[in-house]
From Swiss-Prot:
Its EC number is 3.4.25.2. InterPro entries: ATP-dep_Prtase_HsIV_su, Ntn_hydrolases_N, Proteasome_sua/b, Proteasome_suB-type. Keywords: Allosteric enzyme, Cytoplasm, Hydrolase, Metal-binding, Protease, Sodium, Stress response, Threonine protease. Belongs to the peptidase T1B family. HslV subfamily. Transmembrane segments: none annotated. It is an enzyme of class 3 (hydrolase). This is ATP-dependent protease subunit HslV. PANTHER family: ATP-DEPENDENT PROTEASE SUBUNIT HSLV, METALLOPROTEASE TLDD. It comes from Pseudomonas paraeruginosa (strain DSM 24068 / PA7) (Pseudomonas aeruginosa (strain PA7)). The lineage of its organism: Bacteria, Pseudomonadati, Pseudomonadota, Gammaproteobacteria, Pseudomonadales.
Amino acid sequence: MEISPLTTIVSVRRNGKVVMGGDGQVSLGNTVMKGNAKKVRRLYHGQVLAGFAGATADAFTLFERFEQQLEKHQGHLVRAAVELAKDWRTDRSLSRLEAMLAVANKDASLIITGNGDVVEPEHGLIAMGSGGGFAQAAALALLQHNAELSAREVAETALNIAGSICVFTNQNLTIEELDSAV
């Protein structure tokens, strides 16, 4: 699946917190259509953070399906993610959706792709979308060389750096935070 992830989503785990943030830019081709979209939200009674990169309408469908899986599996993040990925691969209507999800709860952070992949990234760090490489490099540098920064500060700084480099990412951020077991 070829996704045009014209956004940046970052999730960071540090010092008992998990943070997920995203920029607010929606682009259509080379035109900015909206600058204050909310691409990160809370699901399952506020216990799960979810963000998307890719087609907005497709992402809302995936949020809905993922939340149904969370309800079905009593909030078990990994099980819900695996079941969504299986559905995404096998259901013809879902297989056409062009988006990726980043999801996190107090225990785990995962990336779910339309190829059926469920990946738990290293370092408790997710960075995806068009500015994901910039954000990941910035976040890793901050995590490795500045122990005083909070998870929120790392995520915000990484997103702002990505927004200053990537033309499909702005600096109008949505940030959500949970206490983490890890």
